[in-house]
């Protein structure tokens, strides 16, 4: 029997077996300071669902993490990763968030770094459209939740057993969550829970794959082509003025202050816009926000929460009135401050032009307002606009 035709298969099989047997420590060195710098605005799954890049991020003092959701990937020249520079900030912004990254997704992501968070400064952007009738959907949970981050969260030595137990209980509410037996055991009796959330062998393979994908990432940053709209040493007032100019030029097709490109999509759909499931003051999302805030306080992180508004003119038009929105805004605010967080509340600006770029995404002038508070928070400057915790 001739082996030559089978050599490629045999070689591939041998390489695969060797890969399985090699320790993850041989690969983690692929993720270094340059990898972190290269991924500041990448918003890839290796950043958002992995642990290696975020491990390095929190070992460094060069970066200021900004957590949120889909607004972080919008091509706006006033996005903090574009607008903040050495003239107005003392650290580089690092973006973490994508569509579907709501409170629980971000809470687990942050909790997986719990032991590194003490004294670390970061901003967490809260979007009002998260607070729906159903909260985090099963679909978004399946797409955005990370097994390796859950596993690393349960390995955090300084995180209390009670906090971990609360996460186990919440995770069990999702039908497709991995390793329900482990979570059930931890939720019932943490001290008797053995093994780990994922096996050592599986963890080893996932970390190796993550390291390789981080090194050879092919996806381009959604902000790669975006350039600053003002000179590097522009004042905040100059930036706001320019933001208004750009916002005005980008919203000529409608009376709602919605970006022309997005307005065209609304017109083309020819369907009545229904958002009745949003702005629910009894949304389960509030419990996830409370868990996140309590986790960050227990970890000793210096978090600036930012509550952004919606487009008030548009939401009035589609039947979700100011009173309903204000009730949710107020509860977001109280959930943060009553649980030990400080908040920059922008929700009084939901009728201000060029703060929101479509229905819900912050843009233009809204970003500049936030950029200024982020820069102040970075540098430890006074922030009279920020409400402090009540306890």
Curated annotation (Swiss-Prot):
Q: Give compartment(s).
A: Cell membrane
Q: Example GO biological process term? A: symbiont-mediated evasion of recognition by host antimicrobial peptide
Q: How does it sit in the membrane?
A: Single-pass type II membrane protein
Annotated TM spans: 6-26
Ranges in a coiled coil: none
What ranges does the Cytoplasmic topological domain annotation cover? Answer: 1-5
Broad class of the protein's primary localization: membrane
Keywords associated with the record: Cell membrane, Membrane, Signal-anchor, Transmembrane, Transmembrane helix
GO cellular component annotations of the record:
plasma membrane
Pathway it acts in?
A: Cell wall biogenesis; lipoteichoic acid biosynthesis
What's the stated role of this polypeptide? Involved in the D-alanylation of lipoteichoic acid (LTA). Could be responsible for the transfer of DltC-carried D-alanyl groups to cell membrane phosphatidylglycerol (PG), or alternatively of D-alanine residues from D-Ala-undecaprenol phosphate to the poly(glycerophosphate) chains of LTA. D-alanylation of LTA plays an important role in modulating the properties of the cell wall in Gram-positive bacteria, influencing the net charge of the cell wall.
Into which family does the record put it? Answer: Belongs to the DltD family.
Kindly provide the name given to this protein in its UniProt entry. Protein DltD
Q: Which organism is it from?
A: Staphylococcus aureus (strain NCTC 8325 / PS 47)
């Amino acid at each position: 029997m001739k082996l030559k035709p089978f050599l490629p298969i045999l070689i591939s099989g041998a390489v695969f077996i060797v890969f399985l047997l090699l320790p993850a420590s041989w690969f983690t060195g692929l993720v270094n300071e340059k990898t972190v710098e290269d991924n500041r605005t990448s918003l890839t799954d290796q950043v958002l669902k992995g642990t290696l890049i975020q491990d390095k991020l929190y070992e460094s003092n060069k970066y200021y993490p900004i957590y949120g959701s889909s607004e972080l990937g919008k091509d706006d020249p006033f996005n903090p990763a574009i607008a903040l520079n050495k003239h107005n900030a003392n650290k580089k912004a690092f973006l973490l968030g994508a569509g579907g990254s709501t409170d629980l997704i971000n809470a687990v992501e942050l909790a997986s770094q719990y032991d590194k968070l003490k004294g670390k400064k970061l901003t967490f952007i809260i979007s009002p459209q998260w607070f729906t009738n159903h909260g985090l959907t099963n679909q978004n949970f399946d797409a955005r939740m990370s097994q390796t981050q859950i596993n690393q969260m349960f390995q955090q030595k300084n995180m209390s057993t009670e906090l971990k137990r609360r996460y186990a209980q919440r995770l069990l509410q999702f039908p497709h969550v991995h390793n329900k037996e482990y979570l059930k055991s931890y939720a019932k009796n943490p001290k008797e829970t053995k093994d780990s959330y994922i096996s050592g062998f599986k963890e080893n393979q996932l970390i190796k794959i993550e390291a390789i994908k981080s090194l050879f990432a092919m996806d381009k940053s959604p902000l790669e082509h975006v350039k600053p709209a003002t000179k590097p040493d522009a004042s905040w007032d100059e930036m706001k003025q320019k933001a208004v100019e750009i916002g005005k030029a980008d919203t000529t097709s409608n009376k709602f202050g919605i970006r022309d490109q997005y307005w065209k999509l609304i017109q083309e759909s020819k369907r009545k816009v229904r958002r009745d499931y949003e702005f629910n003051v009894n949304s389960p999302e509030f419990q996830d926000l409370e868990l996140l805030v309590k986790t960050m306080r227990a970890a000793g992180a210096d978090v600036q929460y930012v509550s952004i508004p919606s487009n008030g003119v548009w939401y009035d038009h589609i039947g979700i009135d100011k009173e309903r929105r204000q009730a949710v805004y107020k509860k977001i605010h109280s959930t943060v401050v009553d649980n030990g967080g400080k908040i920059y509340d922008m929700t009084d600006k939901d009728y201000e032009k060029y703060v929101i770029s479509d229905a819900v995404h912050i843009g233009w002038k809204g970003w500049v307002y936030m950029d200024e508070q982020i820069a102040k928070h970075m540098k430890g400057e006074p922030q009279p606009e920020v409400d402090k915790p009540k306890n």
